Amino acid sequence: MKLHTFGPAANGRRVAVFLAEKGLEIETSELKVREGAQFEEPFTTMNPFHCVPFLELDSGQIIAESIAICRYLEAKHPENPLFGRTDEEKAEIEMWLRRVELDAFIPLLHAVRNAVPSFAGRVLPGTRSDLPQLSVMTTRGVETATLFLDRTEPLLAGKEFLAGDEFSIADIIGALTVNMAK
């Protein structure tokens, strides 16, 4: 199995931290994303959505999307679970994971892609398009994430972890999202 990634990318960092927390080491290929490697063969055939990271299994099957990769690795290596042990833990972790992704991470992703000049022509992940960068998307993304963080802060008072009593994937995604917001 081989992980194709780009270290500086937010989604690549998510998988890297997950691997570190699980104590897993897998073969990794660092794609030259800034040079457009994800739009060239063999990567176009392997991953037609052109996003990193993606996991190439020994069978040749490709698993893309950071959370899907983490879920697959969790299933293959259930020790030190980061998606929860009980049904209740799994549900609470999933709840917070969805909240962080939908209300903070994705809005911030759009904010960055609509503000940073190097993303001109690439405002949607994995695409090259003529969609213009829109400053209103940057403003809305920051406002949305700020609202989420402001609403969440009081809920976390006195808690060590975002979901439940143990470190989880929700904490990884939450911490990386807060870091992205800075």
Predicted regions and their residues:
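GST-like domain detector, emphasizing the conserved glutathione-binding G-site
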Residues: 1-135
